[in-house]
Design a protein with these regions (language model features):
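Membrane-interface "cap" regions at the ends of multi-pass membrane proteins
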Residues: 1-29, 58-63, 67-80, 84-91, ...
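Membrane-embedded translocation segments of transport machinery
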Residues: 2-4, 8, 169, 173-321, ...
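Inter-helical loop and helix-membrane interface segments of multi-pass membrane transporters/permeases
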Residues: 2-6, 34-38, 73-92, 105-165, ...
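Loop-to-transmembrane helix boundary motifs in multi-pass membrane proteins
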Residues: 7, 13-15, 21, 146-147, ...
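Transmembrane helix-boundary motif of multi-pass solute transporters/channels
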Residues: 13-50, 236-237, 242, 252-256, ...
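Membrane-water interface regions at transmembrane-helix termini and the short interhelical loops
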Residues: 34-38, 85-101, 136-140, 151-175, ...
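Extracellular loop-to-transmembrane helix junctions
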Residues: 35-61, 144-145, 388-396
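C-terminal membrane-solvent junction of multi-pass transporters and transport-like membrane proteins
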Residues: 89-92, 339-351, 384-443
Length: 464
């Protein structure tokens, strides 16, 4: 165990790093294409509800467990009472973090490739069809995909190698600032394009057709997973950041702030993408390549397209990388806490391990394209399913039960830790019944019926 725990430079550093871990491509890449797939406004409303009702409370439990134990999610359950079988929750968190990076790193690699395209200007002047062909050519290249994956893993571990303040905190502050400014600029361009009104209607006028097509429980289940993924909660990714927080302030305000800021960025990203998609005749349900085929068309419609595209791809690569680095920080800390390794040794071990684990995602759209689990288009989508639909909800459930059950850490310990400090909001005791009974039962219900809809009812042609 580490004798002296690293800490953030202040509340701003804590918030920025948490936001960096939360925002990332979950908001810029996954949320837009899932919004397109599941019908727009209704999906957004459901995700918003789940952020406030599910994700923020779970985030508070992760922060509390992290600060109370002074450990990462891998060892926190061994340090805090009652120990015993709860330590296996730490192992589930380790698996969940690796699963997350097994598909996420490759998407980060694609953003790096588009940064290169932004520098070279190779997308400038292309037609919408040519932009789409460029995306397909990139994902179809095994060599390019593998090289991009290795580059992201090496860079992310390089940041964690430098330490908390010099590494992940400093990088997060710079990257998030650049990205948010660029999003706002591109948003205004997107909503002023001819035909953008249809995209705004898609985002803000509910349409029940998606419910009838995919099933109510299916969409509700996916919305819950998106909310948890959007805040990176359920697999202990945020627990480690709680362990870096001092006892000077209560945790509820910070958890709420991270949730609201994350949701705000979600809305900004959607406003940046969908009006432009409709303006250029790009289907909102185009899939995971939505941002890679929509945004170049925005730039090609703007004066000074080279400068704007370059700046945006810099920002996109930054925000994608900041999330990957934040999760890698968690894995590095796990090695330090669990095995007593130095930071440098843990970073190097994880570098090798991640290259091996992420290789299937690098090849799944090209030379291993024929190797797919049933009902999944490629291995990357299978890893996404395991993370969002299984690991995150199950992990969130275990964190909540651990913090509220007498057989776990218990409500009294959780409540005391969440409210320790002289600054910030008091987490209300009146929410005990909700946290103890309603929240865990709701997660179980949605998790079960979402999978029933996917695996049992849908193949029978039954949509509920």
């Amino acid at each position: 165990m580490n004798k002296e725990r690293e800490s953030f430079s202040g509340r701003l550093g804590f918030i920025i790093v948490s936001i960096s871990c939360a925002i990332g491509l979950g908001n810029v890449w996954l949320m837009p294409y899932r919004t397109g797939m599941y019908g727009g406004a209704l999906y957004i409303l459901l995700v918003t509800a789940f952020v406030f009702l599910f994700a923020i409370p779970v985030l508070l439990t992760e922060y509390s467990v992290g600060r109370g134990s002074g450990q990462s999610g891998a060892t926190a359950f061994e340090v805090l009472p009652p120990g015993g079988a709860w330590k296996f929750n730490g192992y589930l968190g380790i698996i969940g973090n690796y699963l997350l990076l097994m598909f996420y790193v490759m998407v980060c690699g694609f953003t790096l490739a588009y940064l290169g395209k932004g520098v070279s200007g190779s997308l400038i002047g292309l037609s919408p069809e040519e932009v789409t062909d460029s995306w397909r050519a990139l994902t179809g290249s095994a060599g390019a995909s593998f090289g991009l994956m290795v580059a992201i893993v090496a860079a992310g571990m390089g940041v964690t190698y430098m330490g908390l303040r010099k590494g992940i905190e400093r990088v997060g502050k710079i990257m998030m600032g650049i990205f948010l400014v660029l999003i706002v600029i591109l948003l205004f361009r997107s909503i002023t394009l001819p035909g953008a009104g249809a995209g705004l209607a898609f985002l803000f006028v509910p349409n029940l057709d998606s419910m009838r097509e995919h099933g109510t429980f299916r969409i509700i289940h996916m919305s819950m997973g998106q909310a948890l993924f959007s805040l990176s909660v359920g697999i202990g990714s945020m627990t480690v950041f709680g362990s870096y927080v001092d006892k000077q302030r209560r945790l509820f305000r910070d958890a709420f702030t991270v949730g609201v800021l994350d949701l705000g960025v979600v809305i900004l990203c959607l406003l940046m993408i969908f009006p432009a998609a409709f303006a250029f005749g790009i289907s909102p349900s185009v899939g995971e390549g939505l941002i890679f085929v929509t945004l170049p068309n925005i730039f090609n419609s703007m004066p000074g397209s080279y400068i704007w595209s370059l700046l945006f791809y810099v920002g996109l690569a930054f925000v994608a990388f900041s999330t990957a680095a934040a999760v890698m920080e968690n894995l590095t800390t796990i090695g330090m806490d669990k095995f007593g390794w130095t930071r440098k040794k843990s970073a190097l071990v994880n570098l090798v391990l991640l290259v091996v684990l992420c290789t299937p995602s690098a090849f799944t759209r090209n030379i291993w394209a024929g190797i797919t689990p049933p009902t999944f288009p490629h291995l990357g989508s299978f890893f996404t399913f395991l993370t969002m639909e299984i690991a995150l909800p199950v992990g969130a459930l275990l964190y909540v039960v651990y913090c509220t059950s007498k057989k776990g850490w218990g409500w009294d310990n959780f409540f005391k830790e969440a409210n320790t400090g002289e600054e910030g909001w008091i987490f209300p005791a009146s929410l005990r019944f909700y946290m103890t009974y309603i929240l865990p039962l709701a997660i179980i219900f949605i998790l079960i019926f979402g999978q029933v809809q996917r695996w049992i009812l849908a193949p029978m042609g039954i949509v509920i």
